[in-house]
From Swiss-Prot:
Protein name (record): Large ribosomal subunit protein uL5c
UniProt keyword list: Chloroplast, Plastid, Ribonucleoprotein, Ribosomal protein, RNA-binding, rRNA-binding
Taxonomy, superkingdom: Eukaryota
Keyword Ribosomal protein part of the UniProt annotation: yes
Pfam families per the UniProt record, alphabetical: Ribosomal_L5 (PF00281), Ribosomal_L5_C (PF00673)
């Protein structure tokens, strides 16, 4: 099953970027490699229930099983011992990646209260984009009655663009609503 955004990339976005940046080869055109959704859950060190609910929510949002991250070393100030669960993440590629990106652009971001667009300043020098969301309720898969606490997440869109200008052009063509 090919995703709408995947088809859009090959039929419309790729030719536009070839024309804009005058690439000589189709393989030079930047593309989205993967999307990583990360959620730090520091309270998981004290309560396993928090970690399980966070993992379940991430599974619902992404459509894929998440991975538990563990602390590398003990930090007394944060009351964390070594190898204690401190977060969850999931890496999306292929059709699931395009499906998530489509839902993020068309369903989740417009549901943010007083949404003005996302900042174009969050690109690194390699054309990857990072976005922080403050709550999980913007995703239609999450029901308000079934969450125990509002928790945010970090979303990293990894591209193979050579610089931030190419990455911005790619994500604008996909329809990400950047502030003007």
């Amino acid at each position: 099953m090919t995703q709408r955004l995947s088809k859009l990339y090959f039929e419309q976005i790729s030719p536009k970027l070839i024309e804009k940046f005058s690439y000589k080869n189709m393989h030079q055109v930047p593309r989205v490699e993967k999307i990583v959704i990360n959620r730090g859950v520091g309270e998981a060190a004290q309560s396993n229930k928090v970690l399980e609910s966070s993992l379940k929510e991430l599974n619902l949002i992404s459509g894929q099983k998440g991975i538990i991250t563990r602390s590398k070393k003990a930090i007394a100030g944060f009351k964390i011992r070594e190898k204690v669960p401190v977060g969850v993440f999931v890496t999306l590629r292929g059709d699931r990646m395009y499906s998530f990106l489509d839902r993020l652009i068309n369903l989740a971001l417009p549901r943010i209260r007083d949404f003005q667009g996302i900042s174009a300043q969050s690109f690194d020098k390699y054309g990857n984009y990072s976005l922080g969301l403050e709550e999980q309720l913007m995703f239609p898969e999450i029901e308000y009655d079934k969450i125990d606490q509002l928790r945010g997440m970090d979303i990293s869109i990894v591209t193979n663009a050579r610089n931030s200008e190419e990455g911005l052009a790619l994500l604008k063509e996909f329809g990400l609503p950047f502030k003007s």
